[in-house]
């Protein structure tokens, strides 16, 4: 058996994936969904309502959420990570790496 461990329950498993069973994958993704819902509004304010976000210290709040979630991972999940690897996210969404430029006429172009 390889040294792979399920990201959710911590059980060793022989597969190539990150989870030993569908239930573990579902629990992992449900936790990501709930945490993401908490983070979404704060991030959008941080990005698009910068003045108010600074006044309310939104970036500090987002960092506190992440720290609390990581502490929860250490406490309840044997320190296993609770996020997808950045390269996996970017691999499935190549448009996130695109560079958008605007020419003199105001047209957008992607490289």
Region locations from a protein language model:
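BZIP DNA-binding basic region
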Residues: 1-34
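Long, charged interaction segments in nuclear RNA/chromatin-associated proteins
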Residues: 32-111
